From Swiss-Prot:
The gene is rplD. It comes from Chlamydia trachomatis serovar L2 (strain ATCC VR-902B / DSM 19102 / 434/Bu). This is Large ribosomal subunit protein uL4. Belongs to the universal ribosomal protein uL4 family. NCBIfam families: rplD_bact. Transmembrane segments: none annotated. One of its GO terms (molecular function) is rRNA binding. Keywords: Ribonucleoprotein, Ribosomal protein, RNA-binding, rRNA-binding. Part of the 50S ribosomal subunit. One of the primary rRNA binding proteins, this protein initially binds near the 5'-end of the 23S rRNA. It is important during the early stages of 50S assembly. It makes multiple contacts with different domains of the 23S rRNA in the assembled 50S subunit and ribosome. Forms part of the polypeptide exit tunnel. GO terms for biological process: translation. Pfam families: Ribosomal_L4 (PF00573). PANTHER family: 50S RIBOSOMAL PROTEIN L4, LARGE RIBOSOMAL SUBUNIT PROTEIN UL4M.
């Protein structure tokens, strides 16, 4: 069992968060790579479309006579060598090219990414009160002070909370969104593995981490 320190808004350690050993079971790094590639590939619209010589709108009249001009013979203005002509080997919308990742692979990849952050000391656990009741109004200065008190490197920080705190965490969300050190504010129930991989440091609420461990560890037992 792994113990993680829990911090309050003043940066004081108030206890430990217990992580089961099953959370750190070995997994395939290839699954992480496949998952991240799928996320990026599926952002594409796959809608690029060009017109070939048979699709462009042009007269079928021969540009000039076959012989006597000294030019190479031409038969149609829709040919690709003419301005406004068709495109050769241009992109076309093909079949559905979205990459599908099943739930088990997705959860395994997210678990491995989180385990790496924990093992390298890039994830800290904040008490639920930090997200819910620490601020009575949005205060960017106080949010920055919290990061410094917890010895969090102020670079690429990702805040992760639970959807159960939506609304009550609005003051903290508004406080951190204007910090250049903060990468984003998301929720554990719909977190993306790409956000975890791209973040340098993660500040997660106790409630969000409980939900993540429950969903990810139960998957490893199946």
């Amino acid at each position: 069992m792994v113990l993680l320190s829990k911090f309050d808004f003043s940066g004081k350690e108030l206890g430990k968060f217990e992580l089961p050993d099953a959370f750190f079971t070995e997994g395939r790094e290839q699954s992480v790579k496949d998952y991240l590639v799928a996320i990026q590939a599926n952002k594409r619209q796959w809608s690029a479309c060009t017109r070939g010589r048979s699709e462009v709108s042009h007269s079928t009249k021969k540009p000039f006579r076959q012989k006597g001009t000294g030019n190479a013979r031409q038969g149609c203005l829709a040919a690709p060598q003419f301005r406004g002509g068709g495109i050769v080997f241009g992109p076309k919308p093909k079949f559905d090219q979205h990459i599908r990742i099943n739930k088990k692979e997705r959860r395994a990849a997210i678990r491995l990414l989180l385990a790496q952050k924990i093992q390298t000391g890039k994830l800290i656990v904040a008490e639920n009160s930090v997200f819910v009741s620490s601020l009575d109004a949005p205060k960017t200065k106080e949010a920055l002070r919290f990061l410094k008190e917890c010895n969090v490197e102020c670079r690429g920080v990702l805040f992760v909370d639970s959807l159960a705190h939506v609304g009550s965490n609005e003051n903290l969300r508004l406080s951190v969104r204007n910090l250049s050190a903060v990468r984003g504010f998301t929720y554990g129930e719909n977190i993306s593995g790409y956000d975890i991989a791209a973040a340098r440091n993660i500040v997660v609420s106790e409630k969000a981490l409980e939900l993540l461990v429950e969903s990810l560890v139960s998957t490893t037992k199946d």
